């Protein structure tokens, strides 16, 4: 049977080792957070629209609806870029007509050996209407959709396809977003045919 003194003799080095490990971890965390690099780093794109914590439920709903809409367009990009149509998680952000139309249009493009590469920019998204009291809360959004850097290319050769020179590549789009049990979903996306 060990005495209290012999137990302390074994515990003290372990305690000191744990303290040294904790101190080293803290020092590493502090130095890694305070990098001296002047190069700004791009923030990662959110993989899912996370609910916003806010004291004002109206402002939180607006932020969540906009975040969902922006994530929706990132998934649309993925869907159009993947000829198999399997890499996108569009159902996390879209439903109803919006989901049906995007899936149908992407399939049509893929069936014709076309993919879209590049980026869609959702500019100045704003909530223009909000109804949180209905059975299914709903928001109406307006934004400037810029598809000028979203190129249609041959899926095999990656060569750009010629498109009409007078097509709108930056236009106003009106969208409806509903809050479902699993989160906000884009249910309708309607280009307004106006430049922005």
What are the roles of these predicted feature ranges?
Residues 42-43, 62, 140-141:
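Charge-rich, low-complexity terminal tails
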Residues 42-54:
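Extracellular mucin-like PTS domains
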Residues 29-32:
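C-terminal motif of bacterial Sec signal peptides marking the signal peptidase cleavage site
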Residues 34-37:
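Bacterial signal peptide processing site
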Residues 52-120:
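Core segments of small alpha/beta cavity-forming domains
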Residues 92-196:
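Structured, amphipathic secondary-structure segments that form assembly/contact surfaces
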Residues 3-21:
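Bacterial N-terminal signal peptides that target proteins for export
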């Amino acid at each position: 049977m060990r005495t209290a003194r012999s137990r302390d003799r074994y515990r003290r080095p372990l305690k000191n080792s744990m303290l040294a490990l904790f101190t080293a971890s803290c020092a590493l965390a502090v130095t890694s957070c305070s990098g001296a690099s002047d190069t700004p780093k791009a923030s990662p794109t959110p993989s899912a629209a996370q609910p916003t914590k806010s004291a004002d439920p109206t402002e939180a709903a607006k932020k969540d609806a906009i975040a969902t809409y922006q994530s929706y367009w990132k998934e649309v990009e993925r869907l159009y870029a993947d000829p198999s149509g399997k890499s996108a998680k569009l159902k996390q952000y879209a439903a109803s007509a919006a989901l049906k139309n995007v899936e149908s249009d992407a399939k049509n493009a893929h069936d014709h050996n076309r993919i879209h590469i590049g980026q869609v920019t959702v500019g100045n998204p704003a909530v223009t209407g909000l109804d949180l009291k209905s059975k299914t809360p709903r928001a109406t959004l307006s934004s400037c959709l810029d598809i000028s850097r979203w190129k249609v290319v041959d899926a095999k050769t990656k060569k750009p396809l010629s498109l009409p020179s007078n097509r709108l590549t930056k236009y106003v789009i009106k969208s409806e977003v509903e809050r479902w049990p699993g989160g906000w979903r884009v249910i309708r996306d309607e280009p307004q045919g106006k430049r922005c």
